[in-house]
Design a protein with these regions (language model features):
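Sec-dependent N-terminal signal peptides
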Residues: 4-15
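Repetitive, compositionally biased segments used for assembly/scaffolding
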Residues: 18-138
């Protein structure tokens, strides 16, 4: 089962990994920078760099901090709240909007692409070993 999941994930993300780097912004006015969604695990601003500010599960502005407002499944500002009303947005470096980063399937303009869907579905497992999941996905 793990092998099948790994292969499916790898195939789904090939296009995204090579595409435009997406930036995550949270907060009520979407003015709180939360890191880069699909950047290298060695990028200091990547959510996949577990030693960096945005990839650490201990940083208050990390989506991987289950006790923080951007990582808790109970916070309206978290992408992992299935009923969240203020989820983060995804934009590129020019500010083009790619959708809301949210597990809330009823949210209009929700980013509905594979990387976001996998992160929302497996966030609890991912936060336990961000590096391992990066290797599976990219």
């Amino acid at each position: 089962m793990k092998k099948i999941l790994s292969v499916i994930i790898a195939v789904l993300f090939i296009g995204i990994a090579n595409g435009q780097t997406l930036l995550i912004y949270g907060g009520s006015n979407h003015d709180v920078y939360l890191g880069k969604l699909n950047a290298s695990r060695y990028d200091s601003e990547s959510i996949w760099n577990e030693y960096g500010r945005y990839g650490s599960k201990y940083n208050s502005n990390s989506i991987w901090n289950e006790y923080g407002q951007y990582g808790s499944k109970y916070s309206s500002y978290s992408p992992f709240n299935e009923y969240g009303s203020n989820p983060p947005v995804l934009v590129d470096s020019q500010g083009n909007f790619y959708g809301y980063f949210t597990a809330n399937r009823y949210r209009p303009k929700r980013a509905n692409f594979d990387l976001v869907n996998i992160i929302c579905e497996y966030h609890e497992k991912i936060r336990e070993d961000v590096g391992e999941w990066y290797d599976k996905i990219f």
